[in-house]
């Protein structure tokens, strides 16, 4: 098994940190400090070395320390391709983010070629009751860990969709270019939908196989393209292309693309109660989310032979003793780098003896 982990992390003008230098090992790491000390900021900085905008999905201008023009995050990281230096920096004046791998610029969606991460934050506990966009992004992040090329596909799809919207809204008379764009969107959609379905199959098996103290979930996806594939429809690319063509007039008025894999929803059910997670109590929702994360970790390691970095923000809060102890034993048994935030060590003393403590 290959472990992805940080050897060091350096922050400059990042949120509340003017400068911060951390040295770490391939072990559990506990960030301990009062609320507002910057624990979650450190997790967020690490998450920037994975496709997307980090675990807060924050606007980049907001991550710079107040009154500073730039911020920098640097990491020496054991990646899928070996030891490497990664940097990501943002300048307010240019409103640009630049990410580098060993001093060579790379696109944000390329990061999944080098790293693998899973995270769980208090904000995510509302994912079952929020909009479908949050759940879809959550599912796609899971897919990244099984298929690193998926991030690039999602990025390309969003680019072509933006181009299509622009042509329609601005009434640009170029039917040939529009046809090419819709064909590209259809082809990419087919790959995205199949990747999601394949990952859901893996994840469902992982959930069913893992005996733990958390409720099991049934996973599915509610999307026209995915359902057509599940129903065995042939020529799926031609079907998507035709749908995009037929919705041109409607989408011109709406100013957006009304059909496609960007409209799909990730559905989660409490297996035993047979009800959608959004109708469960907040405590049950958190427990289901933890169960999904544990299954993802287990199966990602089993299938890809790669252990991701795990970021857990205040994960032990509001867990009963039985579940907290099970989670601690599970995490220790992973033998990988994971980052946990907490305001105190009460209830996790045993875990703390096996972790690197960083006090803020």
From Swiss-Prot:
GO cellular component: a single term: cytoplasm
The keyword Nucleotide-binding appears for this protein: yes
Binding site residues for ATP: 33-40
InterPro entries noted in UniProt: DNA-binding_RecF (IPR001238), DNA-binding_RecF_CS (IPR018078), P-loop_NTPase (IPR027417), RecF/RecN/SMC_N (IPR003395), RecF_2 (IPR042174)
Subcellular location: Cytoplasm
GO molecular function, one term: ATP binding
Record keywords: ATP-binding, Cytoplasm, DNA damage, DNA repair, DNA replication, DNA-binding, Nucleotide-binding, SOS response
GO BP: any one term: DNA replication
HAMAP family linked: RecF (MF_00365)
Family matches, as PANTHER family: DNA REPLICATION AND REPAIR PROTEIN RECF
Role of this protein: The RecF protein is involved in DNA metabolism; it is required for DNA replication and normal SOS inducibility. RecF binds preferentially to single-stranded, linear DNA. It also seems to bind ATP.
Family under the similarity heading: Belongs to the RecF family.
NCBIfam families named among the record's database cross-references: recf
UniProt protein name: DNA replication and repair protein RecF
